[in-house]
Amino acid sequence: MIEANSKTQFRTLLLLLVAAGFLLFLFCIRPLQYPVSPGTETVRAAIAKTGRVVHAGGFLITESGEQVAYTNSYDALVNMYEQGNRVCEIDIRETADGVLVCAHGTGEVFADGCDLPAVAESDEFLSTRIYGQFQPMTVEMLTAFMRANPDLLIITDIIHQENESVCRKIAETYPDLMERFIIQIYHESEYDPIHRMGFPHIIYTLYRADDQERNYWRISHFAEAHELVAITTQKEQFYLWKNKLAMQHCGVPVMFHTVDDEAEFHSMLQKHYVLGVYTDITE
């Protein structure tokens, strides 16, 4: 009996030593990061300068004093830029008549308190005012602002299944701005088609990933084989120890969304592996 217990204890100890050795190996070996181009380093440096990625144009104050977010409006773009921000995430979708507009869903745009149809015509979209006062924005208006302000970078958030088709339209219409559009992909399969279009800067964003894709070791292996600006995830998922270990192993910086508590925002930026944080706060 004593001998059997000793064997069991020995096996348990051996398994623990093997597991500890494996973890030590993962912590100590050099991350297998995909070679990073100077362009990607420049984009990362631009994001890291403040760590702030303004989400959907950021907060605005209405005439009644209400603080609102998610407008993707021209007013929000101008406001966040005047506050000194140079990296902005913008939602983009296509209207019923094929015009690219800056909106998460046109049903969220209010005209005198009434929702527009889910996919409005472009003239209807532009004739309304968001929250009764803010100017809706087309991608044509956005790119004109980008050309007037050459230090501005735009991270795309493209609605539902339109990612590749919208990126193709941007590439065909605004080829001179492709290096300043940072494209978010939502599935591994989107990387190659979008990269082949000529977009050099890609972020892998996990909020639409399915359960299989959200395996962080799988994500780590994907990052080791593809050039990425960053991986964007929710902090609650990242802080699970196995997920954190996988992300740190691949060497690609992490970004979090969306954090509107100022103290938490600054605290997260102190972590060496965090490149930036999406936030509605503009100053």
Per-region residue spans from a language model:
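Phosphate-group recognition and catalysis centered on beta-loop-alpha active-site segments
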Residues: 2-283
